[in-house]
Amino acid sequence: MKKTLQDEIEAILRKRIMVLDGGMGTMIQRYKLSEENFQGQEFKDHSRPLKGNNDILSITQPDVIYQIHKEYLLAGADIIETNTFSSTSIAQADYGLEHLAYRMNKCSADVARKAAEEITLQTGVKRFVAGSLGPTNKTLSVSPSVERPDYRNITFDELVEAYQEQAKGLLDGGVDILLIETIFDTANAKAALFALQKLFEENYASPRPIFISGTIVDKSGRTLSGQTGEAFVTSVSHSDPLCIGLNCALGAAEMRPFIETIGKCTTAYVLCYPNAGLPNTFGDYDETPAMMAMHLKDFAVDGLVNVVGGCCGSTPDHIREIAEAVKNCKPRVPPDSVFEGHMLLSGLEPFRIGPYTNFVNIGERCNVAGSKKFAKLIMAGNYEEALSVAKVQVEMGAQVLDINMDDGMLDGPSAMTKFCNFIASEPDIAKVPLCIDSSNFAVIEAGLKCCQGKCIVNSISLKEGEEDFLEKARKIKKFGAAVVVMAFDEEGQATETDVKVSVCTRAYHLLVEKVGFNPNDIIFDPNILTIGTGMEEHNLYAINFIHATRVIKETLPGVRISGGLSNLSFAFRGMDAIREAMHGVFLYHAIKFGMDMGIVNAGSLPVYDDIHKDLLQLCEDLIWNRDAEATEKLLRYAQTHGKGGKKVIQTDEWRNGSIEERLEYALVKGIEKHIVEDTEEARLNREKYPRPLNIIEGPLMNGMKVVGDLFGAGKMFLPQVIKSARVMKKAVGHLIPFMEKEREEARVLNGSVEEEDPYQGTIVLATVKGDVHDIGKNIVGVVLGCNNFRVIDLGVMTPCDKILQAALDHKADIIGLSGLITPSLDEMIFVAKEMERLAIKIPLLIGGATTSRTHTAVKIAPRYSAPVIHVLDASKSVVVCSQLLDENLKDDYFEEILEEYEDIRQDHYESLKERKYLPLSQARKHSFHIDWLSEPHPVKPTFIGTQVFEDYNLQKLVDYIDWKPFFDVWQLRGKYPNRGFPKIFNDKAVGEEARKVYEDAQNMLSILISRKKLRARGVVGFWPAQSVQDDIHLYAEGAVPQAAEPIATFYGLRQQAEKDSSSTDPYHCLSDFVAPLHSGVRDYLGLFAVACFGVEELSKAYEDDGDDYSSIMVKALGDRLAEAFAEELHERVRRELWAYCGSEQLGVTDLRKLRYEGIRPAPGYPSQPDHTEKLTMWRLANIEQATGIRLTESLAMAPASAVSGLYFSNVKSKYFAVGKISKDQIEDYALRKNMSVAEVEKWLGPILGYDTD
């Protein structure tokens, strides 16, 4: 028998590690080819630029590509890749060359073949050519439109067609291997595999070995489309690749753990060709050949790889070093099997079903025939809301999700495609495998074409005969799916035990022997049929299924058993308690007999032992056919019993402990109820606690130490800590009068009294002058207080002299400064200078949203010779403060900080040298362009001037609240895939606490609104507007802009940081989104300011009452309501007040994802970082007089729960970050604003692209 290429290459892989070549693009760049070089003679008159289209060089500059191939081969590469990464008609459409796809691949393969054969002849070592099939520039799993998560700009069939054309060219050019590489989206790779299988089935060419290489995009270990490495392997292993592995995105060191994972879950050989390290700030790769070779040699020595090479940034020098490094290393020995006896499925994550896997719940509610709610949503076209049905199933424990769109009123394939695409947009649903369920095979195919994971098909049968059965089975295998086979043949549905076994046995042999199905991918459904119908012939249906299950599992190795559970109890429709009990009893027995999985309503299955004993007996009698009257008895039971439920018994068992145990328990659990009486009981025990201070120093501080330890270990969360602090304050509050009385008695007796301090240290905290934001500072204060620090909180807008005086008065050990807005940074610098001048040499902590380690190290620390430390959040503050005050640790800690900050400073100054900026004049030439004359003209607002909104209805705002920032306040952050609201509730670590805090918030919100504790006021204004270069001029109503003076000007800042040379991205400025004065097109600009009043007063009242938790809660809710007010008002602006989107119909999710036209950027934020622009807003719209929202000297808004910004209506407007800018723009901006350069530099300090010191 003739040896195949697969045999030949596999023989080499068993002997040694093979070497793949390196980066093609990296080498092409070295030739510095011009547009003319790319065009060559043939394409000199082509209508589009071709520079950058590396693949065309195989036609226009074949000698260059040939030379690159030779260099890699001479460096030691066993395998070279064709220059065809983007040679599909899909990718080439960008260059207008899609018609050349076949030729491009054929020419590239010819060139590579020629080089390989020449070096084979020259060296006597056979070299191979791998045909590269890249990912294309489109994806099946990710929508290119944020607004339409179900939209795809490519189909599976289009990809198959494109990959077939590419593969034909490669095969005709003589490639030895087909390499599907840089897989960002596994669905695309599955289309490529489908195309190759099709070609080989059609005998287009003899089969070639297949190599598959995925791309893990970062340290999360996932592809761009969200799959883990193991899920990726599971999804593509049906193609039996000779090699599977990873390339691109990561350097070798970063790739190692993911290569290890790949090796553990495949019987294929493993290939690995990483980048030459990670890209630096200029996009270049810094890893030397020696470094890269060292890493890959480690891989080889540890038995991880069979093929190694290089991707981006690697060169023949890298490959030479790599080849030398691994030449004496033994190759990885692939295991004979992995996960033996397991069914392997995948969504974004792998799911293995093995001999010891518990019963698998296949969620049933995404079925238009089985769920009225789901059907109603799908029929109404409300797919996004229908996702909630899927989500609930997964949350309730469904490990696989059944999707069924079989309804005569639906276009089944279209509905299946759309819903599967929606699922792909939701990681918390897409993580589980899908079960594509339909009686119409066209619908099944439609579903399979959307799924990147390994699915289950439900179902096929022998109903239409063997030929139909085998045809469908082969297609399913080509998609890589597992299959459910119904016990149904040409004679009909099997109801008797022996017939069920017979039909399943016949199907098994057909699948395994004629189709080549892995037995582990076969699931039999022996038909769960309805019992309790009153018809005698139905009485044995449950027993027959159970007995058939046992025989099938015993006689057909590897298979699984499933069934649709709801069929069993269909006779008891509407009697949920009866149905759920029947399901629980049936499964209890069926699982014992071998049932592995079932289509169930996840979460509604009762535990067998929890079923009421009378109901349990009735269900047992019905299922096992023990009582002819079982159906009637069940119906009578249903009439006399409700659903019932277990009563939760509260226990106060902890109250039986000692006084110390009770105090500690109350503190840890945040229970206030008994704290005063327990504290008093301790106080009265004079023998144990002679003085009230002893109680604070003893049991109370011991309890708070436990709280601090649990918080530090991540076993308690911020809301719990704050509740503990509330209990502590109440206990201390009870003791204070007794301590003061004791102190007074001592003073009278002795004439003076020595102060005693039970605290670890004293810390003065303040939000700096001009800033009104203090939630973060307050939280830090509470956490420090819980850890035995005395906290002096000076509140907001605190002048420097007051901070320093308080530090002296209270003999502070540390000062902590907080700020949210950028001008606060300058105030912090000023405080540091004053501390140095006055020789107040105590540590200075810096925190707040606008602060950073870099700013602290570069701008603040050099002004002060004592420790200056940036503290990220409350959880870090305790560790920092403890080290700063520990006599044994503080000197070493400070020395470490000094060294760290010096490194940060040096890195910063080096980065300033490396940054490149376009001159402002050039940036303006590359501005964002809108063709104002051909675009629809801007809509005029319904009024010009301002409209004030008094006492706005807060209830209207509740639905617009974005809860994610609320949880951020409490430092509750879920981990993927449970980030954000409401997914955070599913997080194992913080979910429970998040739900508690959310419930507390709902309760407080209800009180705040119903009792009118807060008030919302705002203002909106519109004016005619025209852009003049980077500025926007506003005009009075009726004025002719070309002939009138503007009544106000908003000044813009333009991006200047140089973009990559290959980028065509414009350099944005907000003025780009307003029609220019010279265009003659009338345009408009809006502004708004909204606030929630009463928050500070309520917060202060709670604080005075010792209730820090409620104090912080009301501020967090005030901020959320203000943001919700801004969101709701913007919607009204779009639909009513400006009415440029009168027909907009968006849900809250759409608003959160910015799926609307127009933007509302705020001064002081990335699109216009200059806070002084607020002064123009306040003057123009008379905002303070209209609403009561005022500006502080640092231009923060007061009250703190306030939001303001500008309204832009253009459909092309978008948010962007100005980023760093250079001095020429600062000087230009200062001139336009009539400000000094120094003053502008002060306000724009954080975005200066140069150092002013």
Swiss-Prot record:
(6S)-5,6,7,8-tetrahydrofolate binds at G370, S371, K372, D437, N458, D525, N567, R573, R579. Residues 6-326 form the Hcy-binding domain. Its EC number is 2.1.1.13. Its cofactor is methylcob(III)alamin; Zn(2+). GO terms for cellular component: cytosol. CDD domains: methionine_synthase_B12_BD (cd02069), MeTr (cd00740). GO terms for molecular function: amino acid binding; cobalamin binding; folic acid binding; methionine synthase activity; methyltransferase activity; zinc ion binding. Residues 760-895 form the B12-binding domain. It is found in: Cytoplasm. Binds 1 zinc ion per subunit. Methylcob(III)alamin binds at E697, G770, D771, V772, H773, D774, S818, T822, A874. Pathway: Amino-acid biosynthesis; L-methionine biosynthesis via de novo pathway; L-methionine from L-homocysteine (MetH route): step 1/1. Residues 359-620 form the Pterin-binding domain. It comes from the Eukaryota. The keyword Nucleotide-binding does not apply. Zn(2+) binds at C248, C311, C312. Residues 911-1253 form the AdoMet activation domain. It catalyses: (6S)-5-methyl-5,6,7,8-tetrahydrofolate + L-homocysteine = (6S)-5,6,7,8-tetrahydrofolate + L-methionine. S-adenosyl-L-methionine binds at D962, R1160, Y1215, F1216. InterPro entries: Cbl-bd_cap, Cobalamin-bd, Cobalamin-bd_sf, Dihydropteroate_synth-like_sf, HCY_dom, HCY_dom_sf, Met_Synthase/Corrinoid, Met_synthase_B12-bd. The modification Phosphothreonine is found at T1252. Catalyzes the transfer of a methyl group from methylcob(III)alamin (MeCbl) to homocysteine, yielding enzyme-bound cob(I)alamin and methionine in the cytosol. MeCbl is an active form of cobalamin (vitamin B12) used as a cofactor for methionine biosynthesis. Cob(I)alamin form is regenerated to MeCbl by a transfer of a methyl group from 5-methyltetrahydrofolate. Modular enzyme with four functionally distinct domains. The isolated Hcy-binding domain catalyzes methyl transfer from free methylcobalamin to homocysteine. The Hcy-binding domain in association with the pterin-binding domain catalyzes the methylation of cob(I)alamin by methyltetrahydrofolate and the methylation of homocysteine. The B12-binding domain binds the cofactor. The AdoMet activation domain binds S-adenosyl-L-methionine. Under aerobic conditions cob(I)alamin can be converted to inactive cob(II)alamin. Belongs to the vitamin-B12 dependent methionine synthase family. Monomer. Dimer. Forms a multiprotein complex with MMACHC, MMADHC and MTRR. This is Methionine synthase. It comes from Rattus norvegicus. The gene is Mtr.
